[in-house]
């Protein structure tokens, strides 16, 4: 029995060491969460009261990230310059693009796309140029933005919701 004790002790410590090394490796290979933007004060680097129930995010190769904020019927723009540095882009003086509401039903943008085709989807109500961003809304409408403080409803499907 005496001969088994040192071997069992050694095997146990090798197993503990392997477990510890595996845990250390998992921590090194893991990730760190950094909350960049939130509507909850103190939760992230930037507190933005417009970022309520965000659904969709898009961007172009030259634009900041656009967030569709269903809870405020807006889109906000954020520039991310490295892993953890974010700034809100001051578009239209207040940092938002308004997404139009309808008279009834649920409101707010849910999804969006960036339109890179400069000869397609001209904005009715805008300056006549192609839409830069197109939004799908809970109210069944499709809105488009080319410039200015507000997107414009382009298509309405009654009873879509």
Across the structure, where does each feature detected by a protein language model lie?
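N-terminal secretory signal peptides that target proteins for export/translocation
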Residues: 1-6
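Bacterial N-terminal signal peptides
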Residues: 9-20
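Sec/Tat signal peptide C-region and signal peptidase I cleavage site
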Residues: 20-26
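Sequence/structural signature of beta-propeller domains
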Residues: 26-161
């Amino acid at each position: 029995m005496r001969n088994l004790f040192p071997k069992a002790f050694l095997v146990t410590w090798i197993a503990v060491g392997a477990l510890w090394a595996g845990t250390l490796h998992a921590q090194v290979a893991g990730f760190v969460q950094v909350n960049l933007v939130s509507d909850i004060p103190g939760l992230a680097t930037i507190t933005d009261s417009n970022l309520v129930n965000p659904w969709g995010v898009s961007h172009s190769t030259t634009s900041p990230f656009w967030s569709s904020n269903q809870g405020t019927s807006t889109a906000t723009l954020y520039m991310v310059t490295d892993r953890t540095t974010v700034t809100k882009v001051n578009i239209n003086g207040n940092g938002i693009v308004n997404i139009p509401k309808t008279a009834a039903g649920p409101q707010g943008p849910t999804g969006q796309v960036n339109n890179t085709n400069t000869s397609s989807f001209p904005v009715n109500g805008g300056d006549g140029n192609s839409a830069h961003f197109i939004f799908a809304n809970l109210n069944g409408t499709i809105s488009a933005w080319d410039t200015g403080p507000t997107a414009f409803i382009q298509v309405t499907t009654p009873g879509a919701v």
